[in-house]
A protein has these predicted regions:
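Active-site helix of classical SDR
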Residues: 29
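Alpha-helical segment proximal to the catalytic Tyr-Lys
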Residues: 42-45
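A short helix-coil junction within the Rossmann-fold of NAD(P)-dependent oxidoreductases
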Residues: 1-5
Length: 121
């Protein structure tokens, strides 16, 4: 195809790295996105296609609303979790999209700073 080139930005999740209790279907699909991102990155090289993945944690959407109200933790406790403004994710996507095709951010994690990610459980 002419012209060639482009950029794909996949939507991952911190849950692929540190799952929540009872989240096997969601976690496994987000883990699969990592394999997809790596495969597209490799196969896309000859077509000048760059592929990135953003692993998102606790961005303020309808899906995450329950986290600020309290969600089950690995310990079995229900705890409220911090939420970040989803506009920060949009800015990160924009910044990746603006890169020249000879430059790539392969993987990025963006999350509420104090969410239980490091040391989850």
């Amino acid at each position: 195809q002419q012209p060639q080139g482009g950029r794909i930005i996949n939507n991952g999740s911190v849950s692929a790295h540190v799952p929540r209790p009872g989240s096997a279907p969601y976690t496994s699909t987000k883990h699969a996105i990592t394999g997809l991102t790596r495969s597209i990155s490799l196969d896309g090289r000859k077509f000048n296609i760059a592929c990135s993945q953003i692993d998102i944690g606790n961005a303020g959407t309808e899906m995450t609303k329950r986290m600020s109200e309290g969600i089950i933790q690995a310990s079995g406790d229900i705890k409220k979790e911090p939420i970040m403004d989803v506009s920060h994710v949009a800015k990160a996507v924009y910044d990746i999209a603006e890169l020249p095709l000879n430059t790539n951010i392969q993987f990025m994690t963006i999350m509420a700073s104090s969410m239980p990610y490091i040391g989850r459980g």
